[in-house]
């Protein structure tokens, strides 16, 4: 699917994506003005709760309590995050096999093995990965990977809803050349934005990607009542319910790889369903788009 894309996009915050030659200016991570989530182990954190649901080890009692409340509200949430993870591994293997060597993971969360850099390095040991998150615990974990001598990994502090400063901060690492094809990952983050904002944000990012770039998106789709309950349970973030039509619209201007937007459990490159995929409450919808 294709559509006209604006040449000077703005983020939901009104930031114009500009810079020399029309590209975002290099902005040091500390200068983005992005609000950070303060580290407090006595308060629940969604990234650490997610890590717990995936079987990770970087969490505290309040995070496990939050995860327990989420499971009580919607017992399928653990399966959802695991479906998302399995899809991401398949998607990254596919993209890496196409020769993409640059990756930007928006709202990365705590690294879970296999992490993005571990997956893509199966195909190219020199692939560069920059992780973006607004949680200092996540950033510290990810930067520790680079501190171990990996010259092709970095992490920047950023609010994914503000494309201009995020793209500038990523560029400032020196690991990503926006003039070359990039794989942009937005996995399980767009349900924290309303549909209109999510469309604006994804359009702002994709409009500045080089031709041949790949965009991976996954979105948790549940019943509106469940999203409202989760919002009340975890008051640090609001969760929005997106329809299949919303998720398709996040790929506006991109060519979708078959089977297009589909249930993450069934998504495989080149697979084509004989009938429209059934929508079900509590599913993860996923897809990969390519820029022209």
Regions of interest found by a model, annotated:
Residues 267-292:
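Core SAM-dependent methyltransferase catalytic element
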Residues 159-164, 191-199:
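Active-site glycine- and acidic-residue-rich loops that bind
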Residues 238-264:
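Short alpha-helix
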Residues 222-237:
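Short, glycine-/aromatic-enriched active-site segment of Class I SAM-dependent methyltransferases
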Residues 176-190:
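Short SAM/SAH-binding signature in class I
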Residues 1-158, 162-164, 168-178, 206, ...:
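Rossmann-like AdoMet
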């Amino acid at each position: 699917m294709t559509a006209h894309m604006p040449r000077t996009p703005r983020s939901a915050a009104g930031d114009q994506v500009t810079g020399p030659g029309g590209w975002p200016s290099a902005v040091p991570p500390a200068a983005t003005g992005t609000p950070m989530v303060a580290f407090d182990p006595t308060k629940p954190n969604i990234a650490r709760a997610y890590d717990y649901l995936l079987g990770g080890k970087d969490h505290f009692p309040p995070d496990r309590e939050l995860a327990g409340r989420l499971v009580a509200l919607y017992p399928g949430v653990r399966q959802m995050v695991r479906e998302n993870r399995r899809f991401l591994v398949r998607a990254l293997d596919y993209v890496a096999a196409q020769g993409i060597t640059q990756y930007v993971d928006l709202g990365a969360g705590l690294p879970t093995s296999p992490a993005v850099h571990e997956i893509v390095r199966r195909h190219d040991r020199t692939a560069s990965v920059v992780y973006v998150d607004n949680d200092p615990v996540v950033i510290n974990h990810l930067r520790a990977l680079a501190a171990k001598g990996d010259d092709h990994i970095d992490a920047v502090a950023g609010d994914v809803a503000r494309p201009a400063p995020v793209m500038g901060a990523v560029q400032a690492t020196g690991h990503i050349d926006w003039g070359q094809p990039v794989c942009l990952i937005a996995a399980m983050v767009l349900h924290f934005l309303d549909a209109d904002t999510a469309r604006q944000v994804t359009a702002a990012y994709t409009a500045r990607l080089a031709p041949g770039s790949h965009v991976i998106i996954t979105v948790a789709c549940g019943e509106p009542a469940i999203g409202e309950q989760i919002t009340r349970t975890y008051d640090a973030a609001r969760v929005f319910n997106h329809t299949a039509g919303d998720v398709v619209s996040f790929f506006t201007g991109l060519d979708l790889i078959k089977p297009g937007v589909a249930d993450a459990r069934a998504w495989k490159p080149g697979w084509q369903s004989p009938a429209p995929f059934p929508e079900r409450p509590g599913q993860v919808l996923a897809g990969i788009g390519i820029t022209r």
